[in-house]
Amino acid sequence: MKRLVLLSVGALMLAATVFASVAMAQEGTLDITSATLGTGGSVDVSGTIQCTAGAQYFVQVGVRQTTGNRPYNTGSGSYPVFQPATCTGEPEAFTITVFGGKPFKKGTVLVNGFAQVCDTDSCTFPEAPNEEFRLR
């Protein structure tokens, strides 16, 4: 009985280690590194995503700017546009051009992002929380 308990505990520990590393392996990381004022009042948002080689990914970003006492000016964009991209296991750089309801102007913008990273078994959704950038 004691041997069975020890074997069961050992098997559970091994399973937890294996499954935790598999779950962590497909999880991606998303980092927004810059936001710059682009042509026509757009905002170019750059960043990186890193995920397990062979997984498929899609990134979306949102930009928000206050306009005095008026409602926010917002816009969003995604990368890639038509079909998911494939991870190489290394950080993948991206730049997404975002257009708002009206042209963005010099000043502070709030940028956030999320991604969908999928392998053959499941998907994860890494996020880049709200971060302020100064458009010049």
Named regions from a protein language model:
Residues 15-22:
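C-terminal segment of classical bacterial N-terminal signal peptides
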Residues 53-120, 131-136:
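Ser/Thr-rich low-complexity repeats and stalk/linker segments
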